[in-house]
């Protein structure tokens, strides 16, 4: 009788813990996904889009070549982060991650292509503008699905 009771308690605990673990995994997946895309967006915005808007890639700009190479390295980092996010969305059951993840492979290819040009010191204005359009498409798609993604500047003490 005691063995049956222990088996019943164990089975009940597993039935309750199973869905709870899945819910935690989904929250953890979303947090990791947001981290990777956030890191990619930060690299793009800080080292590519902002200098582009400030004309730091134009001929004759001070440190033009260095800025272009930095942008290329930043896009390589962003492509790695997006690739990690794509891998996460392949096996997830979360509908939001699956939908947003379906938009990422094309974005990753664009990041890599423009990044390779910039790392070689070749300025690709159309590519940078295209990347910005793709970023806005991703942000709008997330908002349409009820998960708005807003860039937030987080102050780091001492910097």
Regions found by a protein language model. Give the residues of each.
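Bacterial N-terminal signal peptides that target proteins for export
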Residues: 1-9
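Bacterial N-terminal signal peptides
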Residues: 9-18
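Non-transmembrane, amphipathic alpha-helical segments
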Residues: 26-36, 56-70, 89-99, 120-130
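Alpha-helical segments in soluble extracytoplasmic regions
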Residues: 40-92, 103
């Amino acid at each position: 009788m005691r063995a049956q009771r222990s088996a019943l308690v164990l089975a009940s605990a597993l039935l309750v813990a199973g869905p709870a673990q899945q819910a935690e995994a989904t929250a953890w997946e979303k947090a990791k996904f947001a981290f990777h895309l956030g890191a990619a967006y930060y690299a793009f915005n800080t080292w590519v889009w902002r200098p582009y808007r400030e004309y730091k890639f134009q001929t004759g700009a001070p440190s033009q070549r260095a800025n272009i190479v930095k942008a290329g390295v930043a896009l390589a980092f962003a492509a790695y982060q997006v690739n990690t996010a794509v891998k996460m969305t392949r096996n997830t059951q979360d509908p939001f991650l699956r939908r947003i993840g379906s938009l990422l492979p094309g974005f990753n290819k664009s990041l890599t292509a423009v990044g390779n040009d910039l790392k070689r010191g070749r300025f690709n204005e159309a590519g940078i503008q295209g990347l910005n359009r793709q970023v806005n498409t991703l942000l709008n798609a997330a908002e349409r699905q009820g998960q708005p993604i807003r860039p937030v500047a987080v102050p780091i003490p001492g910097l």
